[in-house]
Amino acid sequence: MPRFTRRHVLAASSGMALGLAAPSVVRAQPREIFVGGPASPGLTDMLFPLIERKHGFKILFEGSNSLINLEKIRANKARPTMTVTMMDDPVLILAEREKVIAPLKGANIPNLADVRADAKPRDAMWVNWCQPASSIAYNTDSVRPGPASYAEAWDSRHRDKIILISMRITQAVVPLLAAAHLATGKPLAECLKEADAGFEKLKELKPNVLQVTSNAPQAQQLLETGEIDFFLSPDTRTVLFRKAQGAPVDQAQPKEGMVAMPAGAALVANGPNPELGMTFINELLDPETQALIAKTFYSNPTNTKTVKPAGLDLPELAVLDWEYFADNRNRWIERFEREISGG
């Protein structure tokens, strides 16, 4: 009968441990990606399940506004956890400058070739997967007819009946532009450089403002229950989606125009499973998926081969200089919080 020494036992135990550990070394990465993006209705209940079924991978999603999304990417820059980020163009400009997103040009995204040139900013550093419109959201029970002009928000009939979105949210540029237009008469697309006049005009709106918030879902709920008349200014992704579900809300088409809110998608630099990230973005740009996106998010498609769904009636949208916005945003946030929300 063989005699086992302590050395034999230790050697055998070590071999067993290595054998047990081996599967974890060779185990493949799970077929899943972490996507950070807006908390928009229709993403997790319609769009993402379609992509998951079609391509056989799991989408882990966390909804937050674009600036918070960027902060999360910064915090994990050394070891990214996110594969794709879906953010507004002004924040994607910052992400590009900080080198936390990777260019789409040259990536395996065939549908990118059919996307409009103006929807591939910065030489396809990212891509706009839809183009929703922002204006006044209003309660259709309490406001009849809907506002024909942004000027109606300043009417004393709406005292304490308006919620303004925080300037930390990109859509907050719309009431600032509307105020600048009312003060100067210039077209909305030219009013970014008239922000000073816009802030002075916004001060006149304060008696009508119940609160300033960064919690868009809560503001949307208050709009739907009739606690407020106007919400300035979410976009069609949320408002018309809720209208279609029976909520008493609508998106105004003021005579001064609506503002394009290009929604971008980008690959996070050095993010995990980049090939699945490319598949995800390519599917967002597929003509059939683009038609679903246009219908679901009430926005203009960006793939030129997409057949626009019947009944989608958005006017020509004011397109902004988002780089100018990005360069001035911090200054405007400080002024907004000093003079409008905190003054």
Regions found by a protein language model. Give the residues of each.
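N-terminal secretory signal peptides and thylakoid transit peptides that target proteins
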Residues: 1-17
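Early extracytoplasmic/lumenal segment of secretory-pathway proteins
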Residues: 29-93
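Extracytoplasmic ligand-binding site segments that recognize negatively charged/polar headgroups
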Residues: 38-45, 81-82, 86-210, 214-224
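A ligand-binding cleft/hinge motif common to bilobed small-molecule-binding domains
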Residues: 90-94, 224, 229-248
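Periplasmic-binding protein-like
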Residues: 114, 132, 160-171, 196-205, 235, 284-307, ...
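A bilobed periplasmic-binding-protein/Venus flytrap-type ligand-binding module shared by bacterial periplasmic
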Residues: 135-142, 180-183, 261-276, 283, ...
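An extracytoplasmic/periplasmic, membrane-proximal ligand-sensing/linker region
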Residues: 197, 301-343
